Amino acid sequence: MRKLALVPIQFYRYAMSPLMASHCRFYPSCSCYAYEAIENHGLLRGGWLSIRRLGRCHPWNPGGYDPVPAVPTSRSSSMAE
């Protein structure tokens, strides 16, 4: 399911985005952010992170560097090390 959700993002990035001027106020771009968020966090959490990011991408936001949050690690694996 995750890979299926990434197909429209890839299509946009490689087929449609080059035809339009860059409008994203953030780095990485919103499409790169969405791809990475879904790839790292899964469809539900990554999709939610992507929607929140798109909501922040508007002319009144200063933009800037906004990376995808790191994947949380479980406490048991960090205690075992």
UniProtKB/Swiss-Prot annotation:
Location(s) in or outside the cell: Cell inner membrane
Chief location category: membrane
Gene Ontology cellular-component terms listed: plasma membrane
Keywords: Cell inner membrane, Cell membrane, Membrane
Superkingdom as given in the UniProt entry: Bacteria
One Pfam family here: YidD
Cysteines joined through disulfide linkages: none
Topology versus the membrane: Peripheral membrane protein
Statement: the UniProt record of this protein carries the keyword Cell membrane: yes
Record-linked PANTHER family: MEMBRANE PROTEIN INSERTION EFFICIENCY FACTOR-RELATED
Family: Belongs to the UPF0161 family.
Functional description taken from the UniProt entry: Could be involved in insertion of integral membrane proteins into the membrane.
Protein name: Putative membrane protein insertion efficiency factor
Organism: Pseudomonas savastanoi pv. phaseolicola (strain 1448A / Race 6)
